[in-house]
Amino acid sequence: MVVIYLNSTGNTYWIPIYSLNDKIREPYIFYVFAIFQTSIYILTGYILVRICWIFLTIKVFHDNMNIMMCWFLCQWFQAFLAKIVLIPYQFGIIKISMDINKTYYDWWSDTVEKSAILREDVNIWPIYFASYFLWHYMYSILFAVLAVGLERVCATWYIQDYEHVSRRHIPILLIAATNLITLPYAYQTTNNRTPLLQTCLQSIFIGSVAVFGYIMLWRVNLAWRNRIVNLKFTHNEKYSLARKFQIEENIKSLILARKLVVSASVFILVVTILLAVLLFDPHGYDAFFVHALDNSMLLPALVMSLTLLSCSPAWKERFISGLPIIRRLKSSSVAHQNSYSTASSAGKETEAYFEQLRSSWA
C-alpha cells in the first residue's frame, strides 16, 4: 500500500494500492493484465450474485446466518467500485504526485522521503473516499468471521426455539456492531494513524479470538450431541427435536467454518509468498508481483464463496445446473428425448395400425 503525503497540511494517507503512476500501461503487458483483471471481476460478481441468491432460496442454515453471509459477501461490490476509482491513479492515468514520472512500489512507509508527495492543486477526495471504502471492506471481511461466530453463539444460547423464532434483531445488531467497529478502523487506517505493526497484530488477535470461539462452540455442541445419542441429560435439560436439529446445524456450520479457515490460510500463505518475493526486489518481474498482490485484495470474497458452495451438495448442484452452458445442454437433451419419445410413440402407433389392418384382412 502506498503512503501519500499532502504538503499543505502535512497529513499522510495510506492508500490500499501497491503501485502509483505505474508505467505498465505503456507495453502490451498492460492489456494482458487488464483483460485478466476484468475477467476476474466479472466472474467474481457473477458468482457472488448467484451464490447469495442460492443461500436465500435453498436454506441449508438458519435465515439469520444466511442473511449475514450474503451481507458480507455483497460488500465485495463496495470494494469493486472503490477499486474502479483507484485504478486511474494506480496506472498514472490521473497523476497526483509531484514527480509524475516516478513509479511508486511500496507496502507502507513512515518517512516522507519514501512517500508519494502530492501536488498542491490535486483533488484528494476521490482517492481518499475510495481508499476509505476499500479499507472498510477489508476490515469487514476480517470481522465477518467473528460476527458469524457470534450468531452461532446466539443459536446455541437459544437452542430450544431458535428454529421457530426468527429473531431478526440478531443479524441486524451484529451487522451494525461490525460497522461501528470497522468504520472507525477504516478512518484511522486511511489517515495513516494506525502503524503497520499494530494493524497486523490486531488482525492476528481478531483471527485468534474467532478460531478460539469456534473451537469452544465445536466442543460444546459435540458434547450436547453425545448426550442426545446416549440419552444422558441433567435434571434441568430435556430432549426435543428442535434442540437436536439445532445442534446438528451448529456442527454443520462449524465444519463449514473449518473449511473456510483452511482455504483462507492457504490464500494468506500465497499472498505472503508474493509479498516476500516482492520485498526481495525481483528486477524485471516487480510489475508482475505487484499487480498479482494488488489483485489479491479483491479475491477473498471469491475464495470464500467457492468454499461455501462446496460445503453443501444442494448449493453446488443448484449453482452448476444454473450455469448457462449447462442449461443449454440440458434443454437440448430434453428436446432430443422428447423428439425421440414422440417418434417412438408414433412408430408404435403405426405398427399397431398395420397389425390391426392385417388381422382384419386375415
UniProtKB/Swiss-Prot annotation:
One GO cellular component term noted in the UniProt record for this chain: membrane
Keywords from the named record: Membrane, Transmembrane, Transmembrane helix
Entry's transmembrane regions: 29-49, 67-87, 127-147, 170-190, 204-224, 260-280, 288-308
Membrane topology: Multi-pass membrane protein
Compartments reported by the entry: Membrane
InterPro entries per record: 7TM_GPCR_serpentine_rcpt_Sre
Domain of life: Eukaryota
An annotated GO BP: sensory perception of chemical stimulus
Name of this chain's protein: Serpentine receptor class epsilon-37
